[in-house]
Regions:
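Bacterial signal peptide processing site
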Residues: 39-41
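Extracytoplasmic
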Residues: 44, 74, 112, 122-124, ...
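Pocket-lining segment of extracytoplasmic ligand-binding domains
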Residues: 104-107, 133, 170-264
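Segments of small-molecule ligand-sensing domains
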Residues: 249-320
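N-terminal secretory signal peptides
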Residues: 1-19, 28-34
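Bilobed "Venus flytrap"/periplasmic-binding protein-like clamshell domains
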Residues: 44-72, 123-190, 281, 297, ...
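Sec/Tat-exported extracytoplasmic proteins
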Residues: 69, 73, 96, 101-104, ...
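Pocket-flanking alpha-helical
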Residues: 62, 67, 78-114, 182-188, ...
Length: 320
């Protein structure tokens, strides 16, 4: 049996919690409280997976993947709570975790230091304002107070790019802050901020759309983002029924990668990818809307990050 130390990972004290699949809202609410304190169970080597903030899609997906791993008995997955993509990549490169979720545009200089297990979900950039706000476009953020996601999150990187494409200079034209999602929502609700940017799946229940908040359409910026920063950005729609009672808007989508340390043994990588391939239905939160990438045509689309050899072997066998 391959043990955790074979990966070279170091404990950082932020142990994850493994939960069963009861949907996105349940995972971040009642079920989370009921199952809090449970650790990874079952057999197989231990993989520490850097996920994201409590209440976010990364956190929910990591919990579902850990539960699927426990059922399989071939690998154990321990979810690690983080700020998001950039912190995840740093932890993976430093050997603090064995696997990580990250936005494809956050990989950057780490492309030669990590390997991909699969392209799993589409993240939606969601610009949120209060329902009574007059802000209708990114350009109208000039002179306002905007939260661009927690330090270490993918939204912090992508958000700064969005501002630049819209003709705004971060810090100069906009008062930028970096708060975790729940803190950012509290500030927005209290009138201490004018907008927040969140990169995540839809719906994200914490955003309280349309009860108190609404989404700003950013679809017109997708092409300029691709032209300036590369092909990672897509124009996607958040349908009206994603947030019941809300309105459909277009925004920018970025693929999520499930990444592994280069030192991960091939059999361990294969065990994780088998979960993506053969237990895909159990890995999609029941309330999730929009594009999901857990299918054969999309899972292997991880360029510019090469597939882990163990992952590639599973995909070859699956496709025949």
């Amino acid at each position: 049996m391959v043990q955790h130390q074979a990966f070279g990972a170091k404990t950082d004290g932020r142990d994850g919690v493994v939960m069963g699949r009861r949907g996105f809202l349940a995972l971040t609410g009642v079920a989370a409280a009921a199952l809090a304190g449970c650790g990874p169970s079952g057999g197989g080597p231990l993989v520490r997976l850097a996920s994201g903030e409590v209440g976010g899609f990364y956190y929910a997906f990591a919990g579902l993947l850990a539960a699927a791993a426990a059922r399989s008995g071939n690998v154990r997955i321990e979810r690690v709570t983080t700020s998001g993509s950039q912190e995840n990549l740093t932890m993976l490169a430093n050997g603090q975790v064995d696997a990580a979720l990250a936005l494809s545009d956050s990989v950057g200089d780490n492309v030669d230091r990590v390997l991909a297990l699969g392209r799993v979900y589409e993240n939606y950039l969601q610009l949120v304002v209060r329902s009574d706000s007059t802000i209708r476009s990114v350009a109208e953020l000039r002179g306002t107070r905007v939260n661009l996601g927690a330090d270490g999150s993918g939204a912090a990187l992508t958000g700064a790019r969005i501002l630049r494409v819209a003709g705004l200079k971060p810090e100069a034209d906009v008062r930028v802050s970096h708060r975790p999602l729940r803190e950012a929502m509290a500030e927005l609700t209290a009138g201490e901020a004018d907008a927040l940017l969140w990169a995540g799946g839809v719906p994200t229940s914490v955003l309280e759309i349309p009860k108190r908040m609404r989404l700003v359409d950013m679809g017109e910026l997708a092409v300029p983002m691709r032209e300036r920063f590369g092909p990672a950005y897509d124009r996607v729609e958040i349908p009206a029924d994603a947030y019941p009672g809300g309105a459909a808007v277009h925004t920018i989508g970025v693929a999520n990668f499930l990444l592994a340390a280069a030192a991960m043994p091939e059999d361990v990588a294969a065990s994780i990818v088998e979960l993506l391939v053969y237990q895909a239905d159990s890995l999609v939160p029941t309330e999730a809307a929009g594009t999901q990438f857990l299918d054969g045509r999309s899972l292997i689309g991880t360029a510019p990050v090469p597939l882990h050899p163990g992952a590639a072997e599973v995909y070859r066998a699956w496709h025949g």
